[in-house]
Amino acid sequence: MPSITQDIQRCAQHLRDGQLVAMPTETVYGLAADARQEDAVHQVFSLKGRPSTNPLIVHLEEASQASQWAAEITPQAQRLMAAFWPGPLTLVLPARDEVLRSVTAGQNSVALRVPAHPMARELLHAFGSGLVAPSANRYMSISPTSAEHVAQQFEHDALLILDGGRCRVGLESSIVSLLPGDCPRLLRRGMLGRMRLQDVLAQPLQDSDGAVRAPGQHHRHYAPTTPALGFTQVPTAALDSQQNGWIWCGAAHASQGPAINLGADPDHYAAGFYAALYQLDALDLQRIYIQIPTHQEAWAAVHDRLARACQTLS
């Protein structure tokens, strides 16, 4: 059974002992392990059921620690670090030779982030080194935004969970690749949008070239067990069934089944999206219908998660 705590020192010692700790960040809860202990890193892959070809993000307390993991920190990287760290931005940089191959999935790059959540930073300070921390859920399942979500995912495992409350951002970090010989690339959409990143870089961000350099790039991801269907035109016939759940983004229609309205503000919607999926997925429904928000840049990360969580979009 999982154990939920707010004892930072207990969690830090647990990590030093090579064990796993679920820790809060401002994006989602992460399944943390010592990034320099091979056995601990393998435990992360095993517990999540995550393929070893999927690289991990190393979480750091301060930007100054990035040089311990990255072989080169370009002026572009320095500008992004200064602008957005601590915060929901991951940078993919050339890896130092000593970084574990299990962390990088055998690649010559490493993904780094400095989280903004105060308890994550306290834990990183107490631990004293980098932590890998992919989302604290079974592979491809809904990412957790509360300690209770993590406990649901690992209800039969003796996992220590550091309770830092609800995650403020609610969607995984934006990921930018800055590798030598390649243009800057936006590998994963987050609530830190393309335009803000480009403004700091002073150049365009290209999309991924298809190589899996970072988490969250697989097509099917972040998905509930209940079939999820995205819609723009309301499927009115489905409103009459108590076995259909609904997630709305503004003006909602009356329905017989349970409904959650996350509103028309993208930041508020993102912060509550995974929690809404957890809530409806627990009700043994036939389907979850999700209203697709407007196609604007502010909603880009939400659209990305909808495309990966839903079986169909219409």
Give the label of every model feature segment.
Residues M1-S314:
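Active-site-adjacent structural elements in enzyme catalytic cores
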